Amino acid sequence: ATTTTTTHNSKNKQYLAKQKPVELTLGYQNPNGCKVCSFGSKGSIYQKVSSGFKGVSVMTDDKSTMPSVEEDFENIGILNVDSSLEPFKDHFKYRLKRYLHQKKLIEEYEGGLQEFAKGYLKFGFNREEDGISYREWAPAAQEAQIIGDFNGWNGSNLHMEKDQFGVWSIQIPDADGNPAIPHNSRVKFRFKHSDGVWVDRIPAWIKYATVDPTRFAAPYDGVYWDPPLSERYQFKHPRPPKPKAPRIYEAHVGMSSSEPRINSYREFADDVLPRIRENNYNTVQLMAVMEHSYYASFWYHVTKPFFAVSSRSGSPEDLKYLIDKAHSLGLNVLMDVIHSHASNNVTDGLNGFDVGQSSQQSYFHAGDRGYHKLWDSRLFNYANWKSSFLLSNLRWWLEEYKFDGFRFDGVTSMLYHHHGINMAFTGDYNEYFSEETDVDAVVYLMLANSLVHDILPDATDIAEDVSGMPGLGRPVSEVGIGFDYRLAMAIPDKWIDYLKNKKDSEWSMKEISLNLTNRRYTEKCVSYAESHDQSIVGDKTIAFLLMDEEMYSSMSCLTMLSPTIERGISLHKMIHFITLALGGEGYLNFMGNEFGHPEWIDFPREGNGWSYEKCRLTQWNLVDTNHLRYKFMNAFDRAMNLLDDKFSILASTKQIVSSTNNEDKVIVFERGDLVFVFNFHPENTYEGYKVGCDLPGKYRVALDSDATEFGGHGRVGHDADQFTSPEGIPGIPETNFNNRPNSFKVLSPPHTCVVYYRVDERQEESNNPNLGSVEETFAAADTDVARIPDVSMESEDSNLDRIEDNSEDAVDAGILKVEREVVGDN
């Protein structure tokens, strides 16, 4: 099946363990949220544990192995993972044949994939012992020169030579022992069309490009970047270990300032990275690193310098400083990479090398196939031998800048000849494996993922795909495409739909649960409630959808808490937390959403007078101002990330949804050995509410969204232990409570979520000083949170005096005094 109601991953990173089929009644929901048919008949699928919809746990054999594609051509590993793919075996064999053929050619003529991806050492400008070499692939050019500041933009004495493969080259000797082209000087590639016209273009492999900020719509110039040793940034810190599960902070450096201007790499490193680390994220995903001439394109339209950092925020050395600073804080750094298309620009884009030649002599396809109608951009010819340009691009970012992996943008457009345009994928496998599948692009992605993991085995590659392509997140050794994770893109769409179109009473607990668990359990997903997409002008963030204009007038703790703000803060916490806890094996949040930033992004453009006023998304003063309620959402974000850090929620393969009670508006599930209780009812408080669990024993509160530290009312007692009672007849699951062999009772206030952990009494009795403390979950979140009391928690009369007398004093946080015990598979 393309989707299941649970997700689990083999502990073996390479191969899925052998599994037994189970019978399960499914409600079908396709991966990108389109409304499709459903089926109620029983179907045989594979899964490790039940979902709460009467599935049965199965045994696994983690010792199973699978031969590589080179060892056994007939054994297509992915078919052993999903037998439903068997009818498409010929497609996978063809894919494998193409992949192996391409790889063999690369090994035969280039010495292997890693050597093939060293194009930046041959092409573009490279410093040699006694001069500078420059090479450019431009087979359609009739003549070529190199021009720049160094020769007064006169290339008459620097004509280049062309070889049989269309590569132009020149050696520029040193002058008096110094490079003929000074560091940081402007350069361009000048060539003549077949019709005799000369044009100037930015070199395709240039490492840096700048624009004159004093000239409106000035063209970009390539820059020869070769700083002296004293000016080169030297990395000081090693890459941190790859996290068990990524908690990703998606960020745009340029708009990270509180001021209406473009922020710099160094300012981001010094001012923003510590905030990210403080909120317990372990990964930063940087947008808009690749140079793009039009700022408002949000970096999607990459121009010529695919190898160049965006000069708006600083130099290459500044970006290296940022990444090294992130590594020193224990943060992995991923880069948004655009290999799905390129800007249509001619003067400063790779498109400027296309002068009507065939696709064999171009980076792009010719004709309609080389043009994306919706994006107004050019499409790469991935079968061209010059795919080394893109593969080298990946190696360059990994080795020169020490990135730890990539988020590949627009993968859906790459996978299909129709690019996903006007397609509503229903989950029918015929939609994924047909003549519409672009096998050239699939093979390129397989090579790309192989390369990245060959260079950096602990790299993280994430695919942005809305189609739900089966095998996207399976290893290349199984004839999968090789990504480590895929984005769970249907989740934010569902939340936005609920917030825009449904009353609280209309929220379906089963639909929410299905949407969050609707993924291929053998392929890891990164879940998110919102990303940069929801922050762009014309859309709204979750916080703004919940609280709208009241965010501008009712967020002060010095005023009474309005119903809108109370509901908004409560649901903001719940939506993000259940997305993390149930939605995938990784989690992502966009800059500012951790504290409910109210504004949207509006890049400078003609329609707003080229203003940067709305292009400074993160107004940090909102969360730094202690009497504003934004601090509560930020504190909870910090705490839920820390909870995952302690209990490995995202990395756990045990995920069981035991109850989706639509009447009560309550969802109960287990992840690892934690029990989660989400009460989405806007009014009802449930006392003695019975929840099922796996293991017997004593349970305590690990995290409580209603705690005062998080802007709640503090209604859930944290000192009382909850003891389980056995349910049903041992060994007969259908006699249990919600298919769980044990249960305990809790207090569940409206619009709250509470997490319970099982106490290991042996460790408790030993008073082990090395045990982590759940207290830290609250203490870390409470830092600078409770200085100004929220007057809505007390009577109006008592608050007036308290605010006046104690507004500058810290108050007790009431932090939990609970030790954390590691139990089960955690």
UniProtKB/Swiss-Prot annotation:
Its EC number is 2.4.1.18. The active site is at D409, E464. One of its GO terms (biological process) is glycogen biosynthetic process. Pfam families: Alpha-amylase (PF00128), Alpha-amylase_C (PF02806), CBM_48 (PF02922). The keyword Nucleotidyltransferase does not apply. SUPFAM superfamilies: (Trans)glycosidases (SSF51445), E set domains (SSF81296), Glycosyl hydrolase domain (SSF51011). One of its GO terms (cellular component) is chloroplast. It is found in: Plastid, Chloroplast; Plastid, Amyloplast. The keyword Transcription does not apply. Residues 1-58 form a transit peptide. Expressed in roots, leaves, stipules, pods and flowers. Catalyzes the formation of the alpha-1,6-glucosidic linkages in starch by scission of a 1,4-alpha-linked oligosaccharide from growing alpha-1,4-glucan chains and the subsequent attachment of the oligosaccharide to the alpha-1,6 position. May preferentially transfer long chains during branching. Monomer. Belongs to the glycosyl hydrolase 13 family. GlgB subfamily. This is 1,4-alpha-glucan-branching enzyme 1, chloroplastic/amyloplastic. It comes from Pisum sativum. The lineage of its organism: Eukaryota, Viridiplantae, Streptophyta, Embryophyta, Tracheophyta.
